[in-house]
Swiss-Prot record:
Compositionally biased intervals (Acidic residues): 219-263
Subcellular location: Nucleus
Protein name: Histone chaperone asf1
Keywords from the named record: Chaperone, Chromatin regulator, Coiled coil, Nucleus, Transcription, Transcription regulation
Job of this protein: Histone chaperone that facilitates histone deposition and histone exchange and removal during nucleosome assembly and disassembly.
Keyword Transcription regulation set for record: yes
Complex formation: Interacts with histone H3 and histone H4.
A single GO BP: nucleosome assembly
Coiled-coil regions listed in the entry: 181-249
Main subcellular location of this protein, as a coarse class: nucleus
UniProt-listed InterPro entries: ASF1-like (IPR006818), ASF1-like_sf (IPR036747), Hist_deposition_Asf1 (IPR017282)
Length: 282
């Protein structure tokens, strides 16, 4: 909680000529006795494009500060024209009223200021060189922008927390190492799944090759057997050769067809037994 609270700011002379001093009636409340003075400052923003042209118009030390509500008049000089770009004199700019304690700013009030000529004729057709005596400033007092900052006052107890509270258990763990371990574990699990899938695929291919070899072996044996029978039959009788050859030829054709069916069934069975698993990557 802030020891000093700004209650109100009243601009005494507004609108006013450009070269007239600024006058503020400031009201604030102090909740406890302070050891040091309050420092008030007024800054004129000379250009919206660079802080190089900012001017501190005046500063004022107020103290000792009694506990309770306090009021005082803060007066500051007009800005130095030599430090303002000619093109930035007319138009809208900003003034900043700030207060600090022991070098630490705790409140800032910003006002828009419109600088314009006091006649419609000059406003419509401004001269190349500004006529300062004809320029008037108008502070938009109804729309200030107030920013407050938590600071350390006289006691360490009221100092704001600069760092998050200690968390001994959390501090003992290395977040970077833990994150790296999780990544390594996930990568290892993924590699294991891929290797297992490859082994399953290779194993399925072996089954298919074995089935094909067995079928081919059976076909060879049947063909050899058919050839042997044909040779024996040729030795026994020439008259029966044609008929037996036709019969054996028909049997061989049937055996080949059966062999094709068997091979197809074996291949289909092997393909049905082996199905590649879908790998879900998380």
């Amino acid at each position: 909680m802030s020891v000093v609270s700004l209650l109100g700011v009243k601009i005494v002379n507004n609108p006013a000529p450009f070269l007239a001093p600024y006058q503020f009636e400031i009201t604030f409340e102090c909740l406890e006795q302070l050891q040091k003075d309050l420092e008030w400052k007024l800054t004129y923003v000379g250009s919206a494009t660079s802080s190089e042209y900012d001017q501190e118009l005046d500063s004022l030390l107020v103290g000792p500060i009694p506990v309770g509500v306090n009021k005082f008049l803060f007066e500051a000089d007009a800005p130095d024209l030599k430090r303002i770009p000619t093109s930035e004199i007319l138009g809208v700019t900003v003034i900043l009223l700030t207060c600090s304690y022991d070098g630490r700013e705790f409140v800032r009030v910003g006002y828009y200021v419109n600088n314009e000529y006091d006649s419609e004729e000059l406003t419509q057709d401004p001269p190349a060189k500004p006529i300062i005596e004809r320029i008037r400033r108008n502070i938009l007092a109804e729309k200030p922008r107030v920013t407050r900052f938590a600071i350390k006052w006289d006691s360490e107890e009221d100092a704001p927390a600069e760092y998050p509270p200690d968390q001994p258990e959390a501090d003992l763990e290395d977040d970077g190492a833990a994150y790296g371990a999780e990544e390594a574990e996930l990568e290892a699990a993924l590699i294991r799944e891929l290797e297992e899938a490859e082994r399953e695929a290779a194993k399925g291919g072996d089954h298919e090759m074995e089935g094909a070899e067995e079928t081919a072996g059976k076909d060879d044996e049947e063909e050899d057997l058919s050839d042997a029978e044909s040779e024996d039959i040729e030795d026994e009788s020439d008259d029966e050769e044609d008929d037996l050859d036709e019969d054996e030829g028909g049997d061989r054709d049937e055996d080949v067809e059966m062999g094709d069916d068997t091979e197809s069934k074996d291949t289909n069975a092997a393909s049905g037994h082996h199905q590649q698993q879908d790998i879900m990557v998380h």
